[in-house]
Amino acid sequence: MPIDWTTIPEADAVGHELHGLMEELFPVPRSLTGDGVRATLARIGEDVPLRTVELPTGTQVFDWTLPREWNVQEAWVEGPDGARVVDVADSSLHLLGYSVPVDTTVDLATLGEHLYTDPRDPDVVPYRTSYWAERWGFCTSRRVAEALPEGEYRVRIDATLGDGHVTYGEVALDGERDDVVLLTTTVCHPALANDNLSGMALLAGLARVLAAQERHAREVVLSLIHI
């Protein structure tokens, strides 16, 4: 039988608290690796007994070789008039994930080869990545892309892609039995509520509740990691 949360006095307050955490983490630029992931886990660790683990890039984990670490300082496109038409400072969705560094000037046709839009909605900025192929790009709305005039465009992506670490966090609570309950969520997607932030907020809330209990029948591991 489904739980009627409206009958639980504390539910509304808990919901507001978790929503507040999502608002804090929404602007943090996250990806598979990097300082955005570290900042996110550090914030969650203020509320729960989170253990943060860093594994060197290039490490073989089952069938996966851990990718290089990626960090971005700034990324933008300036139009012919010098105004910025796309800027990751406005939204972390604007930059193609794992874009390589670039500092160049291109014409509109060339820029168009590096722009990603959503054909289903003229006002939506899509989320796109290029983890396994070295390229660069920007994501914007189709309406903005189609309104760009002819001319020269300055493109700058100040990013690093190299040796570093893959960072994840976990909360492990001992149990009376040997079997383990694993609860996991992704931590790598930026500025996405359904796909990422809701899972992190929910696990943070669960970790606080479970950590406050004295006994657990099974070991419980709550993991925040890229999958």
Where would I find each of the regions flagged by the language model?
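N-terminal hydrophobic/helix-forming segments and targeting peptides
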Residues: 1-225
